[in-house]
UniProtKB/Swiss-Prot annotation:
The active site is at E45, K133. Pathway: Carbohydrate acid metabolism; 2-dehydro-3-deoxy-D-gluconate degradation; D-glyceraldehyde 3-phosphate and pyruvate from 2-dehydro-3-deoxy-D-gluconate: step 2/2; Carbohydrate metabolism; glyoxylate and dicarboxylate metabolism. The record marks T161 as: Plays a major role in determining the stereoselectivity. This is KHG/KDPG aldolase. GO terms for cellular component: cytosol; membrane. Disulfide bonds: none annotated. One of its GO terms (molecular function) is aldehyde-lyase activity. Belongs to the KHG/KDPG aldolase family. It comes from Escherichia coli (strain K12). The keyword Lyase applies.
Amino acid sequence: MKNWKTSAESILTTGPVVPVIVVKKLEHAVPMAKALVAGGVRVLEVTLRTECAVDAIRAIAKEVPEAIVGAGTVLNPQQLAEVTEAGAQFAISPGLTEPLLKAATEGTIPLIPGISTVSELMLGMDYGLKEFKFFPAEANGGVKALQAIAGPFSQVRFCPTGGISPANYRDYLALKSVLCIGGSWLVPADALEAGDYDRITKLAREAVEGAKL
């Protein structure tokens, strides 16, 4: 972690909403990122769920410098190295393994690993991490479960993801332990396919404004 160019905390506090993005066509990446930034959302999680995901990260990092682009669904050290080379400024994983944690502590970008149990949280803390993704948030008991897990660990902060929606994201943001939330509703697949970037900007702006209430 001593080689990290920035901290996980500084990235997550830039939130409060981090879009969880699936880019199916490379040509969508840059205009989508610009649309989100125009709506006030700068931290973008591009998931490694499609063949063009790494190239999308590379394009956004190069052409939309005002965005803080990271990689989601990072599963192993090889993927961590690949997204780092592509220009990702952070990495998010759905869970944690010791090889991935070791690679992250020796790497140059922050890893925000997913946890759903206290034991997983403590393993991550053993590697010096303090920021985690709580995933899948709603399926694991939602706000009440996160409150209970966070209780003994006052120094730890979270980005809950999974089942987060406009109807419940403010409930998570109200928790002291939560720095931001991750949500897929900001970049609907049909809006991307139609090239409706104004809709993406509108959704981003509504999410940012709603977080202030």
